[in-house]
Amino acid sequence: MEFEIALAKEQSYLDIIPKKASEEIGRVLAELTISPEELRQGTLLNGVPILPLLELVKEKLSTESKTYLHFGATSQDAMDTAMVLMLREALGVINERLTTLEDNLSQLREKYGDTPCMARTRGQLAVPISFGDKIDAWLEPLKRHEKRLTTISKGALKIQLGGAAGNRAAYHEKGETLSDALASALKLSSGSSWHAQRDSLCELTNWLAIISSILGKMGADILVLAQSEINEVTENAEGGGKSSAMPHKNNPILSEALVALAKLNAGLQSQMLLCLIHTNERDATAWILEWSCVPQMLINTATSLGHAIAISKKVKVNTDNMRLNVERFKNQG
């Protein structure tokens, strides 16, 4: 609806549609009450929710204004732009959590970074390192990818306005100008339409998968360090992760979730790569894959960051055991 309001307004500024029609379209859309059931039935019939939504709007428009609703645009223009607007909002949450986690890990490093502990390579004791070295393996990749998000977001958070076949033919020589104006109104990047060019979106979801995998590595490390016979880290110093059969346990449940969510996002990203095989000028089979993958990957990444933040706040670093394990290793020689 935000897309349709902005589209009509910018079209009127460029004299593509009458100002009176634009104002009526904007007013009706702003006041529209949507029936989820009507939208559901229309989506089942047509494959996308845009047609039933437009029908609901047209019922309240004058005969003249109906002609100018959604003028020159296609359902994918509205759907993709709506997805991008929601992506922007979700990425705001994710970036905020990422910054919080980096701050927490930096504080953890400042407090425990000089503590000696054992490196473990290929599942075996290697040589002594510091706990700061281990934290760096979690923190530094997060910092690198926070910087990369700015560039990746610019490519992915882009207006979609291609019309029937992606070339904006309905707008004649005003197509590019309209796209730029619409992008500016919605505070998105502009450029050519990307109906069948999904690489920027796939690059963004790959970023989500990488963030999840970095956190999965953090979770996997903690799962080893929290093992009873090692006991260098307790995931939650306040308790939790209880067992119904073994009350003595304090299971590292959030670290387990980090590993599981990393694997889920890795699998979903493999499906996103298939969306690049977007046949000809539009391909709903690829589109439907995105509808399933993108929201879930956002949820998985935000959840992973939330779990990692909780760990960084509540983790207990058992420095005595770290030093003890180092001394045991030295005494083996």
Residue ranges and their predicted role:
Residues 6, 10, 56, 60, ...:
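Generic, well-ordered alpha-helical scaffold segments in large soluble proteins
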Residues 88-95, 99, 106, 136-139, ...:
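Short amphipathic alpha-helical segments with heptad-repeat character
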Residues 1-3, 13, 23, 41-46, ...:
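Glycine-rich cofactor/substrate-binding loops
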Residues 177-266:
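Acidic, glycine-rich loop-and-beta core segments that form the ion-binding/anion-interacting portion
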Residues 111-114, 148-151, 155, 184, ...:
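Conserved helix-loop functional segments at active or binding sites
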Residues 75, 167, 172, 185, ...:
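A structural signal for small-residue-enriched, beta-sheet-centric alpha/beta enzyme cores
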Residues 1-168, 174-181, 241-243, 253-257:
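A helix-coil-helix interface module used to build multimeric assemblies
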Residues 78, 118, 122, 126-133, ...:
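Alpha-helix capping and helix-loop boundary segments enriched in small/acidic/polar residues
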